[in-house]
């Protein structure tokens, strides 16, 4: 698939949210009537080319929900949300991770997956890899396995892929 359609709809916004940062804005991609569908299809093609065959999709709050549900629909799979703390009503596993300034946490229902599940993690952006690594750790707590991780965008200079060594990592667009 030609990824120019996707790349052309990601807008670089300099100095946001602070000076020196180039923010990659996906809202034009989502606003395009074909944007989400084309992105999900491109993700499905990438998985197929790598022989990755998940049994369920996990999307990380919040933009991972958007792309994760779309990909789950294309692949005919279920979707499990990975949430910020306090958003899930039943018993959860929780993993904390470091941010540039401070820390954050993610949660997942303890019964979100079966031990036989092969979970694909979906999110919009791979930067430092902290959020993705925490998501992997949550999945592993459920005894399921991680089939791979796929992102719309990867910021290569932040080395997030290195944090995820040992896992199948894909990104559609790299900067």
UniProtKB/Swiss-Prot annotation:
Bilayer-crossing regions: none
CDD domains for this protein: PRTases_typeI (cd06223)
Cytoplasm found in the keyword field: yes
Classification via Pfam families: Pribosyltran
Pathways involved: Purine metabolism; AMP biosynthesis via salvage pathway; AMP from adenine: step 1/1
Main location: cytoplasm
The keyword Glycosyltransferase is assigned to this record: yes
One of the record's GO molecular function terms: AMP binding
GO cellular component entries: cytoplasm
HAMAP family documented for this protein: Aden_phosphoribosyltr
Free-text function comment from the UniProt entry: Catalyzes a salvage reaction resulting in the formation of AMP, that is energically less costly than de novo synthesis.
Protein name per Swiss-Prot or TrEMBL: Adenine phosphoribosyltransferase
